[in-house]
């Protein structure tokens, strides 16, 4: 009986770790979807529902979490040594903070959504970019400004020109978005 329990736990651990590992080549959209076909289905569903291009969804996730389902911001340090609290409640693929995630769940009725599930994360990104387009009049095809709104929030968006760090991050997202767009247009998947 004890052996059966141990074997069950080993199989469970292998299954969980196999399903949640980071794709081998996150720089290539085609490679990501060839490795994770269901991710393609989920991203396309979010694109159809919200109008957010798949390549923008991927670029935001790459910047926010590097496709790590358990990603969290690094802990702050006390006296540059002692681990302390995290700077925000960001978590999962989308790095959504608790308050915004709660708002997403309430507004969409997706009460069972979790930040560690790719399906829910791309739907969240679609919802967020859709609201950004409505609130700030930023096109979903404008990766640069969409990412600034995503990173800074709708209220702080207007102040981004004074924040060189955010501008540089947004430029990287824009560049990665264009790379994914080109890759996916040439891919056998045909997005």
Question: Language model features by range: what are they?
Answer:
Residues 1-8:
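Bacterial N-terminal signal peptides that target proteins for export
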Residues 11-14:
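Hydrophobic membrane-insertion alpha-helices, especially the h-region
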Residues 17-18:
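C-terminal motif of bacterial Sec signal peptides marking the signal peptidase cleavage site
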Residues 21-188:
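Catalytic glycan-binding domains that act on GlcNAc-containing polysaccharides
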């Amino acid at each position: 009986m004890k052996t059966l329990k141990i074997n069950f736990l080993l199989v469970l651990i292998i299954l969980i770790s196999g399903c949640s590992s980071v794709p081998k080549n996150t720089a290539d959209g085609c490679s990501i979807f060839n490795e994770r076909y269901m991710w393609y289905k989920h991203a396309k569903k979010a694109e159809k529902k919200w109008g957010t291009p798949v390549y923008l969804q991927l670029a935001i996730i790459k910047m926010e979490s590097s496709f790590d389902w358990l990603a969290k911001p690094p802990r702050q340090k006390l006296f540059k040594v002692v681990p302390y609290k995290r700077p925000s409640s960001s978590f999962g693929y989308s790095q959504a903070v608790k308050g915004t995630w709660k708002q997403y769940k309430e507004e969409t009725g997706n009460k069972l959504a979790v930040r560690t599930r790719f399906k829910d994360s791309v739907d969240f990104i679609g919802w967020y970019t859709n609201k950004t387009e409505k609130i700030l009049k930023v096109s979903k095809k404008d990766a640069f400004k969409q990412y600034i709104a995503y990173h800074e929030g709708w209220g702080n968006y207007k102040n981004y020109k004074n924040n060189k760090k955010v501008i540089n991050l947004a430029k990287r997202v824009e560049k990665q978005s264009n790379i994914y767009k080109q890759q996916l247009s040439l891919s056998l998947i045909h997005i």
